[in-house]
Amino acid sequence: IRLSSLRIESDEVVIERLSELRGIGRWTSEMFLMSCLKRLDVFSVGDAGLRRAMRYLYQLHDPSDADLVALAEHWRPYRSVASWHLWRALDNHWIE
């Protein structure tokens, strides 16, 4: 895979292509989209930190993936930015 060619692909195509590589799954591909390709509208529902932050923020006990995805829809087109803020809040112990 030529990583430079991924810049022009959709998020789902990038995830699909990277996931073909051994040891790379959806979460890693989503982090690549956010960190390397600077995509602003990625939400990684499988990220443990985001799940914990959203449970705290929205006072949820055991939300499903669908619940979290639906809540994150309100953050479009900046779901990556919202995610960065939630990670920062966790890192700084602003939320439990």
Protein language model annotation of sequence segments:
Residues 1-96:
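Catalytic cores of DNA base-excision repair glycosylases
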